[in-house]
Amino acid sequence: MRISFHTIKNYWLYFFGSIGLLLVIAWTNLPYWAKFFVFVLFSYVLGRLFAVYKKKYSEDVIRNGILGAMGIFAIMFVVGALVPVLGYQVGVGLFFALLSLLIARIVLRFSEKGSEYKKWLSGAGIGIFGLYVAYDTNNILKRADYYQGDFITASMDYYLDIINLVRDVMQINN
């Protein structure tokens, strides 16, 4: 697949724009209506960013990615709702696992590793984000003070978990 310079330029604009919007949601004390507006704008920008997947993957792979992520989300939601309170250490462990995954993916971009390594990393991502769903569910249900009534940030946590699950399931199915 050949990607034009214009597409690459737009990709980076949407990529950094989505990170900026995400930081606005996470690190500001905007009123709920303003956070909701930023969340909707973030969803739009992320949709534009993911439009590249329509060119990269077949419709069946995308559908299977969505359905697979929905199944994983449902199972891990139940696990998160049924498990006693998951402590701070679980969150720290998941953060470092996610950071390790990010570093491995960056290294993979610049290395000559094959698609098997990419699939292995996607499988690791599915595991990590599946556990994040359980952890986020546990925080929402068992510790309402964690979000201090900020349902937009709680929704953003779920949204990012789902997006990452879909992406990783699509990479494994491809």
Regions found by a protein language model. Name each.
Residues 1-174:
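A hydrophobic alpha-helical transmembrane-helix feature that marks the membrane cores
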